[in-house]
Amino acid sequence: YMRF
């Protein structure tokens, strides 16, 4: 996921 984007920043996780």
Swiss-Prot record:
Q: What is its main location?
A: secreted
Location(s), subcellular: Secreted
Q: Residues where Phenylalanine amide occurs?
A: F4
What's one GO BP annotation on this UniProt entry? neuropeptide signaling pathway
Can the keyword Coiled coil be found in this entry's annotation?
no
Keywords of this entry: Amidation, Neuropeptide, Secreted
The record's family statement is:
Belongs to the FARP (FMRFamide related peptide) family.
Q: What is this protein called?
A: FMRFamide-like neuropeptide YMRF-amide
